[in-house]
Every structure is written in C-alpha cells, then in structure tokens.
Amino acid sequence: MSRVAKNPVAIPAKVEVVLSSDNIAVSGPLGKLSLPLSGDVAIERDGDNLTFAAASESQHARAMSGTLRSLVFNMVTGVSQGFTRKLTLLGVGYKAQAQGANLNLDLGFSHPVSHKMPDGVTVQTPSPTEIVLTGADKQVVGQVAAQIRAYRAPEPYKGKGVRYADEVVIIKETKKK
C-alpha cells in the first residue's frame, strides 16, 4: 500500500464532501471542486476523515490510492483556504496590470500580451512587477502561473523575465576573452 494513502484526509467543519460511486465532490467557502473516480481505489468516510485503500492488490491500484489521496487533500485545502502563486517580473520596462479577468503584460515585445484568466482563478497586481494568482484548484493555479512564465522565461545571463517568487535562477558567467 502507498505510504501516502495510509494518512487519512481530515475534513474541516466548513467543508462538505459528497462521495458517489464514480465521483467525489468537495464544496466549501471558496468554491466547489469535483473529481472523477475509477474503481481502483476504495474511499471510506469515518466521521470527519476520509481513508483511502487500494481496491485490488495490483501495483496500479496501490499507486493510485496515494495519488487520489493527494488530489482529494488538495481539493479540501483549496475550497477551505485556497492556493496562491506569486510571480515577479525582472527587466527594464517589464510590467503587469490586472483588468478584471485579464492580465496585461508588457514584456519587451513589440506588442502587449493579454492573458485571460480561467474561471476560478483571480489575479492581482500589488505592484507593476508582481503578480498574485489565487484560486481553489491547485492544478489550475499552477497551470496559469506556468503559462504566464512561459511568455518570457528567465534568461540565464541576466535573469530577466517572468519568474516564480521563490524561484532561484542560476546566472551563467559571460564569455571571457
């Protein structure tokens, strides 16, 4: 059995979990998330805890029990606390501005870049060089952050570009004559 799946998922008081044979739905103050289930993992509810176990002894079922436990834990955390991803812009003239569900970026191209936010993700720009993404779905928040970073990834010689706030960019040494 997966070691991750041995730990139960605690359900906070303000979170509601609906478990059916082919779907699990988690709703809370920050939204509602659902996940389709396969028959490889058996989920049991014991009061305020969810326990996960492999339905069969196959390697795939044991691996999926830990994966599903992590996904459900992220869903419960997302609808109760939410997830945040911060990006910083480094470079002369690089700036970001949030306008409703759009993020307008000036990244040194000949044209401005506009990125539309998907449902469930909000964007804020506390300063022109900072972007804060928040949402209930960890996968979607991370995907949007990766898409924004891909517009101008940090280059290795000066480090200019869009980077995660906690990212360390290793700067290469320039060529010596």
Swiss-Prot record:
Gene Ontology BP annotations: cytoplasmic translation
InterPro entries noted in UniProt: Ribosomal_uL6-like, Ribosomal_uL6-like_a/b-dom_sf, Ribosomal_uL6_a/b-dom, Ribosomal_uL6_bac-type, Ribosomal_uL6_CS
Answer yes or no on keyword Cell inner membrane: no
| GO cellular component terms attached to this protein's record | cytosolic large ribosomal subunit
**What molecular function terms (GO) are annotated for this protein?**
rRNA binding; structural constituent of ribosome
Source domain of life: Bacteria
List the keywords (alphabetical). Ribonucleoprotein, Ribosomal protein, RNA-binding, rRNA-binding
Q: Name one Pfam family in it.
A: Ribosomal_L6
Q: Does the keyword RNA-binding apply?
A: yes
What PROSITE patterns does the record tag this protein with? Answer: RIBOSOMAL_L6_1 (PS00525)
Please describe the quaternary structure of this protein: Part of the 50S ribosomal subunit.
The record's function comment reads: This protein binds to the 23S rRNA, and is important in its secondary structure. It is located near the subunit interface in the base of the L7/L12 stalk, and near the tRNA binding site of the peptidyltransferase center.
Family label: Belongs to the universal ribosomal protein uL6 family.
Its protein name is: Large ribosomal subunit protein uL6
Q: Which gene carries the instructions for this protein?
A: rplF
